């Protein structure tokens, strides 16, 4: 292991001169040994990104570069960033380097793994068609999740990605007796704090490992924190377990890559993103997969800049997912939560051979009715309901009931809404929507379907409204 000297600092990018015959490899971790400034973070870790030649390497600082100056000494570690893995990580909050940030002492783990790992080989993969029930009607009906699959929650600012993610954690992680890993990538510290207390109150903290790289941290931390969380999840998977891996938010991972790319002097591509966008996304997503030994079911929140799904970042994420749950601002504006768009959301599992003929027909019937209502909306706005044919009037009435029945009170939002959360089984969800589509609820007022769980609750609410 050789020592080097800092020759240039530009923000998070630091150039270091090493002896020509002993340069560190790409992705090797380096540590600051010279504490020549009271500002500089002790033992600051830097990751090699480029070899510029003549003994100079370009690195990204995984921490604040405040207080760094030319001439400071840096030592090579001879290995990539390695983080603790295994049972010692459960119930703990760690940073990108696997250091504890919950003030609960050191992490009791004997094994460390490098955060850069190859994706499983093609012959090791194991596709799954087993459904994962979430208890959220709109998701179970229109875009069902597969165990060991990848799910994306797409939405702009403030339409409920994190609340939906928390509800899924509440419904799946608490029911699912397995282990979970949560990677907070560039999100608000407050949300990480809320998540920790939520897990603590529900007594599942000892089954969750948490890794956070928040908004206020340098781009190097935000770029690598998803890999840190994934490395911990992979260890559990390789032990033969079924793991839940939550990432909030994949867009911030891309954004950190954009910041790093610009600092490294690469030419930007479309909309200012890094030219390696597809490759960086692929490196992460190809590792989030299920093998013959165990499975990783991943649920990822994806911020959609300016509500534009064609933006390169969400568009690149789409192709890696099995289910896409699209949250719509228009639906949120109607006061319908979860604000999932049933016409935009899709799933590979929505196939009669996987979900069964009845589920498939009911889901398609719901989508057809809503699509017809969408087509008629302009006519209604101009001419009013009276100009519609009886069939269209009936379709509109049913669509409005379906739209309201797709809403549901959440457990995690009880404190805000005052109404208790509801978990609806898949069988109840199918039965309820089948009754509406078949016209068995035509006599009920549409208000009866708003914010209820099962169809029986809608009938009870209708009696109270009369």
Swiss-Prot record:
<dbReference type="InterPro" id="IPR020003">
    <property type="entry name" value="ATPase_a/bsu_AS"/>
</dbReference>
<keyword id="KW-0472">Membrane</keyword>
<dbReference type="InterPro" id="IPR004100">
    <property type="entry name" value="ATPase_F1/V1/A1_a/bsu_N"/>
</dbReference>
<dbReference type="InterPro" id="IPR050053">
    <property type="entry name" value="ATPase_alpha/beta_chains"/>
</dbReference>
<keyword id="KW-1003">Cell membrane</keyword>
<dbReference type="GO" id="GO:0045259">
    <property type="term" value="C:proton-transporting ATP synthase complex"/>
</dbReference>
<keyword id="KW-0139">CF(1)</keyword>
<keyword id="KW-0547">Nucleotide-binding</keyword>
<dbReference type="GO" id="GO:0016887">
    <property type="term" value="F:ATP hydrolysis activity"/>
</dbReference>
<keyword id="KW-0067">ATP-binding</keyword>
<dbReference type="GO" id="GO:0046933">
    <property type="term" value="F:proton-transporting ATP synthase activity, rotational mechanism"/>
</dbReference>
<dbReference type="InterPro" id="IPR003593">
    <property type="entry name" value="AAA+_ATPase"/>
</dbReference>
<dbReference type="InterPro" id="IPR000194">
    <property type="entry name" value="ATPase_F1/V1/A1_a/bsu_nucl-bd"/>
</dbReference>
<comment type="similarity">
    <text>Belongs to the ATPase alpha/beta chains family.</text>
</comment>
<protein>
    <recommendedName>
        <fullName>ATP synthase subunit beta</fullName>
        <ecNumber>7.1.2.2</ecNumber>
    </recommendedName>
</protein>
<dbReference type="InterPro" id="IPR055190">
    <property type="entry name" value="ATP-synt_VA_C"/>
</dbReference>
<dbReference type="Pfam" id="PF22919">
    <property type="entry name" value="ATP-synt_VA_C"/>
</dbReference>
<keyword id="KW-0406">Ion transport</keyword>
<dbReference type="InterPro" id="IPR027417">
    <property type="entry name" value="P-loop_NTPase"/>
</dbReference>
<dbReference type="GO" id="GO:0005524">
    <property type="term" value="F:ATP binding"/>
</dbReference>
<dbReference type="GO" id="GO:0005886">
    <property type="term" value="C:plasma membrane"/>
</dbReference>
<dbReference type="Pfam" id="PF02874">
    <property type="entry name" value="ATP-synt_ab_N"/>
</dbReference>
<comment type="function">
    <text>Produces ATP from ADP in the presence of a proton gradient across the membrane. The catalytic sites are hosted primarily by the beta subunits.</text>
</comment>
<dbReference type="InterPro" id="IPR024034">
    <property type="entry name" value="ATPase_F1/V1_b/a_C"/>
</dbReference>
<keyword id="KW-0997">Cell inner membrane</keyword>
<keyword id="KW-0375">Hydrogen ion transport</keyword>
<dbReference type="InterPro" id="IPR005722">
    <property type="entry name" value="ATP_synth_F1_bsu"/>
</dbReference>
<keyword id="KW-0066">ATP synthesis</keyword>
<comment type="subunit">
    <text>F-type ATPases have 2 components, CF(1) - the catalytic core - and CF(0) - the membrane proton channel. CF(1) has five subunits: alpha(3), beta(3), gamma(1), delta(1), epsilon(1). CF(0) has three main subunits: a(1), b(2) and c(9-12). The alpha and beta chains form an alternating ring which encloses part of the gamma chain. CF(1) is attached to CF(0) by a central stalk formed by the gamma and epsilon chains, while a peripheral stalk is formed by the delta and b chains.</text>
</comment>
<dbReference type="Pfam" id="PF00006">
    <property type="entry name" value="ATP-synt_ab"/>
</dbReference>
<dbReference type="InterPro" id="IPR036121">
    <property type="entry name" value="ATPase_F1/V1/A1_a/bsu_N_sf"/>
</dbReference>
<feature type="binding site">
    <location>
        <begin position="155"/>
        <end position="162"/>
    </location>
    <ligand>
        <name>ATP</name>
    </ligand>
</feature>
<keyword id="KW-1278">Translocase</keyword>
<keyword id="KW-0813">Transport</keyword>
């Amino acid at each position: 292991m050789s020592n080097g000297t800092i020759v240039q600092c530009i923000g998070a990018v630091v150039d270091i001169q090493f002896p020509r015959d002993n340069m560190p490899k790409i992705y090797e971790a380096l540590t600051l040994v010279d504490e020549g400034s009271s500002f500089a973070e002790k033992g600051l870790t830097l990751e090699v990104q480029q070899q510029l030649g003549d003994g100079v390497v370009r690195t990204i600082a995984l921490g604040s570069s405040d207080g760094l100056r030319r001439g400071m000494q840096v030592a090579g570690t001879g290995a990539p960033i390695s983080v603790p893995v295994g049972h010692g990580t459960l119930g703990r909050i760690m940073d990108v380097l696997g250091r504890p940030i919950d003030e609960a002492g050191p992490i009791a783990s004997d094994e460390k793994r490098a955060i850069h790992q190859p994706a499983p080989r093609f012959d090791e993969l194991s596709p799954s068609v087993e459904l994962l029930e979430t208890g959220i009607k709109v998701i179970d009906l229109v875009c069902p999740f597969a165990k060991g699959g990848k799910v994306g929650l797409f939405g702009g600012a403030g339409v409920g990605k994190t609340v939906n993610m928390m509800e899924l954690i509440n419904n799946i992680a608490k029911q699912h007796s397995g282990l979970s890993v949560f990677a907070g990538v560039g999100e608000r510290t407050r949300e990480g704090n809320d998540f920790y207390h939520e897990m603590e109150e529900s007594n599942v903290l000892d089954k969750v490992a948490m890794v956070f790289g928040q908004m206020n941290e340098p781009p190097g931390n935000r770029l690598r924190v998803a890999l840190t969380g994934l490395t911990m999840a992979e260890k559990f998977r390789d032990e033969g377990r079924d793991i839940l891996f939550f990432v909030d938010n994949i867009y911030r991972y891309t954004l950190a890559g954009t910041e790093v790319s610009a600092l490294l002097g690469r030419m930007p591509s479309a909309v200012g993103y890094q030219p390696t966008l597809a490759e960086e996304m692929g490196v992460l997503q190809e590792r989030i997969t299920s093998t013959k030994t165990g499975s990783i079911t991943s649920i990822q929140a994806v911020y959609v800049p300016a509500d534009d799904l064609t933006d390169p970042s969400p568009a690149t994420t789409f192709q890696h997912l099995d289910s896409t749950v699209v949250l719509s601002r228009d639906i949120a504006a109607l006061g319908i939560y979860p604000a999932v768009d049933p016409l935009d959301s899709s799933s590979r599992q929505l196939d009669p051979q996987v979900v069964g003929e009845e589920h498939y027909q009911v889901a398609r019937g719901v989508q057809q009715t809503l699509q017809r209502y969408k087509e008629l909306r302009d006519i209604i706005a101009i001419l009013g309901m009276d100009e519609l044919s009886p069939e269209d009037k009936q379709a509109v009435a049913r669509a409005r009931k379906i739209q309201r029945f797709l809403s549901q009170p959440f457990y995690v939002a009880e404190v805000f809404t005052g109404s208790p959360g509801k978990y609806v089984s898949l069988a109840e969800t199918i039965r309820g929507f089948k009754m509406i589509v078949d016209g068995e609820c035509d006599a009920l007022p549409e208000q009866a379907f708003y914010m209820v769980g099962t169809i029986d609750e809608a009938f009870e609410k209708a009696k109270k409204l009369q």
